From Swiss-Prot:
One of its GO terms (cellular component) is plasma membrane. The chain crosses the membrane at residues 48-68, 79-99, 130-150, 162-182, 196-216. The keyword Coiled coil does not apply. Probably facilitates nickel incorporation. May constitute a multicomponent high-affinity nickel transporter. Not essential for the expression of catalytically active urease. InterPro entries: Chloro_ReproSupport/MetalTrans, UreH-like_TM_dom. The lineage of its organism: Bacteria, Bacillati, Bacillota, Bacilli, Bacillales. Keywords: Cell membrane, Membrane, Nickel, Transmembrane, Transmembrane helix, Transport. Pfam families: DsbD_2. Its main location: membrane. It is found in: Cell membrane. This is Urease accessory protein UreH. The keyword Transport applies. It comes from the Bacteria.
Length: 228
């Protein structure tokens, strides 16, 4: 493969990475994290950390499978996808329940009669972003290997392809979390509107997660693979 062809393939990988970051299960999962942020830069970094987790996992597992010339079974691949559905439901419910905790903290603050603010936002949830990025990376490893092997010929070319693809996912999710973070940031001082956004995001994540698991388990036959 000459340099021009390789550059074209790497560019395509970068563009596909941006597109890949915009898949529904990706953006919905990260939205449940972004919706609880009140600073735009924190929203942006949530996307970056998702991309880091996603890319590092694809790189490690993808290259391991390519070098060992192995394949991930359909059952394992679908099971990892099913795990994504579980996390979507968990993150969705957690986002909704976070409103209850915020209300309880606000209520406690009124009874303390203190001028010192009580921060209900504990830490920056970069670990959550990194975690869901890793899970998404694991779930997408099988497809990534197939895409890489059908695109390039050598292992080092595969490494470059995954890196460019990963860079695209980081940029794609960074762009998305920055854009989606704007309404959450602007509504941070308007409690009712901000909480409504969180409730809607949590509800969408929960419903989509249930649909995602049902589709994998029933429609695509994962449950049958488990019990065969």
């Amino acid at each position: 493969m000459d340099q021009v062809d390789l550059l074209s393939i790497l560019t395509l990988g970068f563009v596909l990475g941006i597109k890949h970051a915009m898949e529904p299960d990706h953006v919905i999962a990260v939205s449940t994290i972004v919706c609880q942020s009140k600073k735009l830069w924190r929203s942006s970094l949530a996307g970056v950390f998702w991309g880091i987790g996603h890319t590092s996992t694809l790189l490690i597992f993808g290259m391991t499978i390519i070098l060992m010339k192995k394949k991930i079974s359909q059952e394992w691949s679908m099971s990892l996808e099913f795990l994504v559905g579980i996390i979507l439901v968990y993150f969705g419910i957690s986002a909704i329940l976070s409103l209850k905790k915020t209300h309880e903290h606000s209520h406690s603050r009124l009874h303390l009669h203190t001028d010192h603010p009580i921060y209900t936002y504990k830490g920056i949830p970069y670990v959550k972003s990194l975690f869901i990025g890793i899970i998404h990376g694991l779930a997408g490893s099988a497809a990534m290997v197939l895409l890489t092997m059908s695109t390039v010929e050598k292992a080092w070319e595969g490494l470059l392809y995954i890196l460019f693809f990963g860079a695209g996912t980081v940029l794609g999710m960074l762009s998305f979390t920055t854009l989606i973070g704007i309404p959450f940031t602007l509504s941070a001082r308007k409690i009712r509107i901000h909480n409504a956004f969180i409730q809607i995001t949590g509800f969408i994540s929960t419903v989509f997660g249930i649909h995602y698991m049902y589709n994998l388990g029933v429609t695509e036959g994962l449950f049958k693979l488990w019990i065969r």
